[in-house]
Amino acid sequence: MCTGFTIQTLNNQVLLGRTMDYDYPLDSSPAVTPRNYRWTSRTGTTGQTQYGFIGTGTDMEGFIYGDGVNEHGVAISTQYFRGYSSYGSTHKADAMNITQNEIVTWILGYTTSIEDMKQQASQIHVVAVYLNDIGEVPPLHYHVSDATGHSVEVSFKEGEVVIKDNPIGVLTNHPDLNWHYSNLRQYINISPYPATANLLEGVTIEPLGNEAGTFGLPGGFTSTERFVRMAFMKANIAQNNDKEMDLMNAFYLLDAVNIPIGIVRPHDADNHYTMYQTVINLTTRTLYTKYYGSNEIVALKLTDDLINRKDMTIFKPEKHITIRKLNDNQ
């Protein structure tokens, strides 16, 4: 149910990557919410954004963002947190009452950094709203980073916003973040370097290839396995000063947790798979998206023109498979 990470490159670019793993046909699209945009929460609260932002979202009883970045370089991705998130059931006086899915609008539309978000958090109250399209109140938490590379988890307890620093910069799903950090202790032996030979009863035991240092790295698609795998790979992926290669490396990291159709089949739903991958450059305020069934990357940069429009802009990019043919006999 989604993997997110944040990485800072050698040339001081901050990138947030995420997979959107789900079993409902989202048909997600890149979109822009401009500065000073008037909006109405499903709780009845009305507001006006202070900052413009771009992201990827879907029309689900109103447009819902799954991720995005604002003009100050604050970025976010939405992820499930079943069994741990708890929302309010009624409105709270003297608070901004919004739904669990509208956290993206608050964070991107009203905050300039994680520190700013922390200062505003006490003014927010999250009210549970049932979504008919998916048949539940989605239990959510959020991976949030700012232009400095600082990352946090945003979750909810009885509707109150809970912010936890996340220096490893990886977020998946349940259990809670403390559990995931503790679980990493089981994998401190995993290394990108080859294991050394060992002498056993006078016999030299050689490692099985250069990859032997990674033996024991989890390979499944549970949230616990994805967390460990992403934490290891993010920490060790080779970096250089090539901005385009940094972008490709971020997508390669996402490929390591990408779920093809047919690999995860819930009893009560269709195939659960990675519907799209997104890499967000917080430094340049650019959104890169790659959809399932396409090998193309579509890019959307947050420009002054988009920020200053009156209404939302939703893009519907075509999805293509591009193959470069080296001869004509194909």
Per-region residue spans from a language model:
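A residue-level signal for conserved active-site and pocket-lining positions in enzyme catalytic cores
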Residues: 73, 117, 278
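Short, surface-exposed beta-strand-loop junctions and turns on beta-sheet-rich folds
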Residues: 22-24, 82-84, 159-161, 169, ...
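Short hydrophobic/aromatic-rich beta-strand segments that constitute the beta-sheet cores
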Residues: 76-78, 163, 287-290
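Short, flexible loop/turn elements at secondary-structure junctions
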Residues: 20, 80, 146-148, 158, ...
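A contiguous strand-loop segment
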Residues: 1-95, 128, 318, 322-330
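Proteins synthesized as precursors that undergo proteolytic processing into mature forms
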Residues: 94-130, 243, 247-257
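Aromatic- and glycine-enriched pocket-lining scaffold segments that form the walls
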Residues: 118-154
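C-terminus-biased signal that marks the final domain/tail of proteins
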Residues: 1-15, 129-131, 137-138, 147-149, ...
